[in-house]
Amino acid sequence: GPEHLNFVFLDFKGGSAFRKLERLPHTVGSVCDLDLAHAVRALRALEAELTRREQLSAAVHASDIRDMVNPPPRLIVVIDEFHALKDQLPDYVNRLVRIASLGRSLGMYLIACTQNPMGQVSADMKANMSVSICLRVRDRLQSCELLGDGRAADLSPAMPGAAFCNDSEQVTAFRCATARDIDAVCRQIAFASRFVGSPPQPSLFTAPLPRHVKDRTVADHAPQRIRFGLADDGINLREATVSLTGGNIGVIGPQGRGKTTLLKTLARHASMADGLAVRVSSPHRRVWSSQWLHGGRCTPYASSDAPPPPHIVWFVDDADELFDPFRTDEQALSFTHALADESVSVVFAVSTIRPIRIPEHCNTRIVFPCGERTSDLMAGVPARLLDMKIGRAHV
């Protein structure tokens, strides 16, 4: 069952060979498109899974997965068009060699498929692959590469599926069976898995961040963590959350990157959480206006006789000028006082990090890269994220 055996399918030429197999309950990852970013995530996930299994094995002092009382599922990684991987992502081939060399004792097995094996599989990888299968080929050298002789070139084209298997001890002839109705097979396997109560297996990796993310209402409106988008760790996506009761939050980035949209999203979700009073302020032609929100709508909360909630969240857009130490107007003084008030969390947007001179001004920074390498690095954006698309940020 899926709790004992998992599959990862990787097709690096965008074919549809594995697309139907994605529905198998055993499948924990699949790449069937031409998106190299998706492929890189899959390879990173396999490395992370190998490391995780090494740690599990070391924790119980087991040299082989078979020695573990509760071993992880055996994982079969099937790579179609292996030569395309080598051409497009050559730096990752050596990492696959590591999986091939260390994975067997940890329950990870690699099946690499290619139309032309000549020069595609390195000597290190061959040394860790105990079985070679060769179907009909046109060139005897291709057969020699896998079988040691040219017999696969002599197979008749009238016998599709005929092949030879070299298991390092002998070469055996066989014929592959054809699965004609993959959809029906997958449906029956999925039904059987549900019938016996096999638990669903978590995915090893997800697709990259989508271009657009729809705003969704927060399910529980918990004031501790407000969900506002998707976070990406390079392998998996998860819900991005931020605490509105743990200190001030600075949203940093140039105009047009998404700061105002983010503030509006956070303010709307916060206004639907219990125990928070939400105030929103923004300048218009150098005149500041403020309003209170409750349930996503404006409310005269500030003028009400009801006691205030235990915590206030103040959203301030375009707050650069409020950091000017020479300003003494009411808005600037209120802003400065709120930054130091533990009963108030200020979520402010500024165009650069320069106004934030005191670390206590914000415990959390959400930075939209501006495109200037030095400025982005100073703002805390990792070098690998400097080329992020507009609308994406680093927390």
Residue spans of the language-model regions?
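P-loop NTPase catalytic phosphate-binding loop
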Residues: 1-62, 67-145, 154-156, 220-371
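Conserved SF2 helicase motif VI
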Residues: 146-152, 379-384
